[in-house]
């Protein structure tokens, strides 16, 4: 499969995961909302790395994915400032994501809503930087 098609597929999967997060929030499946929102962020970052390099990243976790994307885009300084600003939020996502995978019903509505809001903020930042950098 060509890289542009694969990138498009990953972005569609990410958007589906984001919709799933909303659906899970509305039905009270808060741990699944967190898992879906995490997948949304991961897939969007991975898609943007693949779009620029032609390779899927071999790293795990949001920190490493974001650092890899910063390097690929040549925007380390901008990402560094953003990561410092959202450090506690990313730690919250990583901790709650891990807990949500292990224990059903492990988070509250408020935690899940916060999780989704942070996921949207991260993806919004990424998309703004990608747009600023321009086409691959």
Where are these regions (language model features)?
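Terminal alpha-helical segments
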Residues: 1-136
